[in-house]
Amino acid sequence: MKNFLAQQGKITLILTALCVLIYLAQQLGFEDDIMYLMHYPAYEEQDSEVWRYISHTLVHLSNLHILFNLSWFFIFGGMIERTFGSVKLLMLYVVASAITGYVQNYVSGPAFFGLSGVVYAVLGYVFIRDKLNHHLFDLPEGFFTMLLVGIALGFISPLFGVEMGNAAHISGLIVGLIWGFIDSKLRKNSLE
């Protein structure tokens, strides 16, 4: 286990640890305080509280929610950090948090939490870099299909009483695909 964690990058570990610590604090009775301090800006006076544009990604609402998001982030965010460095992952995290939060807020208001918009950005980034850079990550066939199925499930989930941040998922995937495409083209141009 120690060796496994040693192979992970700092940003992957820090963001994962923050999510876990915040979730534990919620379970210990601090949920209302955490929700209030970390939700996306809901009122005009909160617009200048800049942490709110990313802090919503660190809060999770159930065991399954945090397990799903952190599993994907740990694996694929870790791939990005090991391959391209901590700064790349941190930049992708901050930009994807801000954009997916803005889009989800526009569509449904400020009552949303979780890392899934960032997770979809990470997955989109890894997918497009793998496709355009000769299987850089050696992803399995059907990876993109899995992403689309995940998004489709988000649209039918209300039928089962589960609400998902579909706007955050879709905008996150788009952010990751565009960023990965640009980085791939910049890499290709720098090699020519």
From Swiss-Prot:
GO terms for molecular function: identical protein binding; serine-type endopeptidase activity. Residues 1-10, 79-82, 129-141, 185-192 are cytoplasmic. One of its GO terms (biological process) is proteolysis. Its EC number is 3.4.21.105. Residues 32-57, 104-107, 163 are periplasmic. It is found in: Cell inner membrane. Keywords: Cell inner membrane, Cell membrane, Hydrolase, Membrane, Protease, Serine protease, Transmembrane, Transmembrane helix. The keyword Membrane applies. Pfam families: Rhomboid. It catalyses: Cleaves type-1 transmembrane domains using a catalytic dyad composed of serine and histidine that are contributed by different transmembrane domains. It is a multi-pass membrane protein. Gene3D superfamilies: Rhomboid-like. Rhomboid-type serine protease that catalyzes intramembrane proteolysis. Belongs to the peptidase S54 family. This is Rhomboid protease GlpG. The lineage of its organism: Bacteria, Pseudomonadati, Pseudomonadota, Gammaproteobacteria, Pasteurellales. The gene is glpG.
